[in-house]
Amino acid sequence: MNREEFLRLAADGYNRIPLSFETLADFDTPLSIYLKLADAPNSYLLESVQGGEKWGRYSIIGLPCRTVLRVYDHQVRISIDGVETERFDCADPLAFVEEFKARYQVPTVPGLPRFDGGLVGYFGYDCVRYVEKRLATCPNPDPLGNPDILLMVSDAVVVFDNLAGKIHAIVLADPSEENAYERGQARLEELLERLRQPITPRRGLDLEAAQGREPAFRASFTREDYENAVGRIKDYILAGDCMQVVPSQRMSIEFKAAPIDLYRALRCFNPTPYMYFFNFGDFHVVGSSPEVLVRVEDGLVTVRPIAGTRPRGINEEADLALEQDLLSDAKEIAEHLMLIDLGRNDVGRVSDIGAVKVTEKMVIERYSNVMHIVSNVTGQLREGLSAMDALRAILPAGTLSGAPKIRAMEIIDELEPVKRGVYGGAVGYLAWNGNMDTAIAIRTAVIKNGELHVQAGGGIVADSVPALEWEETINKRRAMFRAVALAEQSVE
């Protein structure tokens, strides 16, 4: 973009204008670029492996963000360069997020990647309390004390094209500032110079040395208490209160390693469609989620329910046998069909009448340690609605709550001992162009004050076995704890 085009867009009323360059980066990786450009508070790295087995084309590196929006319960706090500039109470923080995003008027520039910046971060599970009056208050304590919503204004990003081995660097310039175009170009030149610099190699991680190492942890439930909670849910199901509830437990351990080393280990052990590393300054969120919560792209709303799990086999023949076993399991199929119906209902709340479709039904996706039954539900976003309306309708996912959703969440509030926080919420971005891509925050670690917290649960139905449900929560955290053992080598 030349200076005349920049000034023309400013005259059209845009108050943030993207400037960019493209360059070859075939000697770099998304991780090396993150370490060169963004290894500081309020930065992030987003990557993807499609279907559990193929790297997604684009990785996104978010440079440190100056402006951050945090919401605690109903209190909104906005800070710029670490200094709080606004604090006020808000009846509907989700509606305010939409208003806040509208402060940034950014044109769509041809030739740029589909994500060129936006609001990036998370919406916690408890955001449902802004929407559902029956869930307006949470009776449980919140020992971590993190925001219910944390969104960074991402105004400088590097998009890594894994296929072409090149990058787009994009910065937003504010045309109200003096010499805005020249300052934006100078920032791009500075980024290019930093990209040319070598990085200090990090210590290698020995994959074999981490085998079989299981750190001791403390859990929010004892085994007896968790199994009793499962029994209580089964009583509710038999009484007709609900069909399924998804309780969870939090497991916490001491953690001394660098959070980025945990991400390195996790992307090796458990590559998934949604991998993310967030440095929020006083805490980190590091995850490898297999499941989209909701995606909105050019008006198409997508959810992709996952339910039904088997371990991976030792070879292709064993994998196929396990697939057949999974697809012939009546309990797993019944649970999955219920979640397809829940997904259709959620998408239908914001879609044109008759536009909701199940475009994939009960296919198997393989990941590093497990395989899942997966379906795909889409709808056309109704005119006058936005991506935030879709998020409001769908958060939290049925796979993390149950059915009927509101009654299931009431039971979760009754039985779980602590507030869920990030777990079960949405992690991802709201792009300037109106698109959104969010993952369900599962298989995700929250690192704060020298401790790592990971949460896992499972769907309880009428014939669930309490002892097996406890084991399922333990098994689901194994990939994360294996990654912890690998990351901790860096401090040994």
From Swiss-Prot:
Lineage, highest ranks first: Bacteria, Pseudomonadati, Pseudomonadota, Gammaproteobacteria, Pseudomonadales
EC numbers on record: 4.1.3.27
Expression induction or repression: Expression decreases as cell grow from early to late logphase and further decreases in stationary phase.
Activity regulation details: Feedback inhibited by tryptophan.
Family: Belongs to the anthranilate synthase component I family.
Molecular functions (GO terms): anthranilate synthase activity; metal ion binding
Protein name stated in the entry: Anthranilate synthase component 1
Summary of the knockout phenotype: Cells lacking this gene do not grow without tryptophan (auxotrophs). About 10% decrease in pyocyanine production; double trpE-phnA disruption requires anthranilate or L-tryptophan for growth on minimal medium and does not make pyocyanine.
Binding site for chorismate: 308-309, 423, 443, 457-459
Species annotation: Pseudomonas aeruginosa (strain ATCC 15692 / DSM 22644 / CIP 104116 / JCM 14847 / LMG 12228 / 1C / PRS 101 / PAO1)
Subunit relationships: Heterotetramer consisting of two non-identical subunits: a beta subunit (TrpG) and a large alpha subunit (TrpE).
